[in-house]
């Protein structure tokens, strides 16, 4: 797929208690899937179909065989197995590293496209939210570094206005470490009108 093209979108929300919801818009209608167990998603197929994939692959030993293509269904199956296979830890940096390893394993490789699958698109960035330490990690395919925002350093009061971290054209600005001081005043994001 190409940046700027219409595509299926799922939005994942989670909180510090481990609660989770997946929001998806199908034919302009919002559907919310709410369950603590919903820890993985891809933009396609519909989330109910992703749950069916989980049921199918849940019967297969993922240490012996997992699907390996760039198709969303295969990436979802890998991520679903791996998120439950990584070690659970109270060390937040180790936990973030483990989650990044799952996301990288399930990312669509750079430049891969399939003619009859226009929504198969390169993974351009990955994010991990650390609810415990209130850190938001970001990794761009263009950057050699993972960087993060310490949300405790951000003033979310309405009076401070909108701020953004300018990643530059195609996310080519390079950041390293904690970047809350690099945020600049900006205009609010404007959504394109629905067709």
Where are the regions that the model predicts?
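Structured, non-membrane catalytic/scaffold regions adjacent to prosthetic-group chemistry
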Residues: 1-37
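C-terminus-biased signal that marks the final domain/tail of proteins
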Residues: 4-7, 16-18, 39-195
